[in-house]
Amino acid sequence: MIRKIIFAVLCSLGCTLAAAQDWGGRYKLQFSQDEAADYTGDLYLVPLGPEQAEFLLTVVHKAGDTIVYDSTDGPVTLTDGKFVWRFPGGDFDYTLTMELYPESEGGVPLENTIRVSEKVGSGAPPYNIDLSPDGLYRRDLSYFVAPNGYMYHAEGEQCALALGGIYSGRVDLPATVVGPFGKVFTVSGIESDAFAYSRALGQVTIANPDQRVAPGALTWTEIPYDWNKIAMPFFAYPCKSRDRFVIPYYDGFKSPENNFQWVIFKQGVAPSKLSGNTIGKDNALSGRVDQAFDRTMGTFYTLQIPKAEINKMFRGYEAMEIEALVADMDFVAFHTFPPFSRWKFPEKVQNAPKAIVNQVARKYGREVMYSRRVAWLRDGYGELDLVEFQHKNHQAMVVFAWIIGNDVAATCSLTTDIESEFDDVDVWNVDDDGTFGIPDVVTIAKDPEGNVIIFLAKNSPESISCFALRQVGDKLERIDFDQWYRYIDIN
């Protein structure tokens, strides 16, 4: 889908003259060692010529308060080594000065540094929060502005789009760009916050399918989000070293279209590359085969990150405890993956809040058997709870509830006859006591509107059922994916 989408970013900044490369780039607010850095500042300067530039200045407090200034109403002009910007419209008597060649208190020139200072005339500044953009901003030399006017973040021989500009409606991502001193970089893709301050992003093209659009990058844009056109991810499991993953084969299985995919586990998202296929091989086994990973019938992917990052991504989990997703670029680019905690065996089980249980019980009119907290966002703004009811008329019933604040935002109920044989695609897989238990949350994805898609794996001794719950209004829509047979012994 990404190759077919034409998406855009605000950026027709024109060609950048070589003389302006001396100061074009990204600058970060500096703090002394004895200062408490509870906020950050970033200044982006994109040259339009030797004496004009577009700029973006952001100051963000850790609590969320933000100042954003930019040159929406026209570029700033260099005069006597300073860019001076005045708040547009006349509503505020406010001036921002960006001095390119500042000196220390002792008169020593400060290289790769810009001094930002604000001047408030009569009245108050345009913001009413306890922040100020004042300070010294030091250049991050890993960022550069290419002749096409885009800002890139370099790493080795490659670079990724870091800021596509802010004031036009289209960006065409090139295959290569010329950086400082004439060095040619291969453009690897787009960073996740490259469009964070865009206003009318409507059209962008990428040069080739090997370029990657980072997680959440398109959530900032005006590109239409259509769940029905996004390629669904696949459930997968890892080898013992957790650097290779396989999507087990099932009837009707079609391998992902692109060789480059992303592996998702909890909030971790890492690039991967196609590395094997055993579909149709005589000795291949369909299901989860932990004892003989390479005999799994399916499609294999290898992570493209260092071992240290793999260890961090799966810290606290052995391979046999992991189910993950293999996802195409369009799914990853249109969703964010917030950090969350989940229940993990053998941790102590936590009951869901009593007020939530009461809300769910009233909604469904059943007597509660037990409740469980399944997973909760670390920012405190979202929680998945599970409530199982007493059996009624030989029927078992469990409800998943997505909680925001103190209220039930969306629910999904699952029922089954307790005396029936469970279908192969059933997500119940009840334990010996006839209860549902707690499924493993593989990841929680958020779409551009903030709705969640929760991917779960329900483990039992002989199989794993993979499904998802997608928030649609006040309902969690259940999406069945696959059920794996778990091989215990291999003859």
Language-model features: locations:
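Hydrophobic h-region of N-terminal signal peptides that target proteins for export
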Residues: 7-19
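Central antiparallel beta-sheet cores of small beta-barrel/beta-sandwich binding domains
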Residues: 21-107, 119-128, 134-140
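Structural signature of tandem-repeat unit edges
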Residues: 144, 149, 166-189, 198-214, ...
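N-terminal leader/presequence regions that precede the main folded/catalytic core
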Residues: 222-339
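Surface-exposed loop/turn elements that mediate protein-protein interactions on large endomembrane-trafficking
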Residues: 346-362, 402-430, 469-477
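Structural signature of eukaryotic scaffold interfaces centered on beta-propeller domains
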Residues: 369-381, 440-448
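Acidic/hydrophobic-patterned starts of short beta strands in beta-sheet-rich repeat architectures
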Residues: 380-388, 448-456
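Structural motif
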Residues: 393-401, 462-469
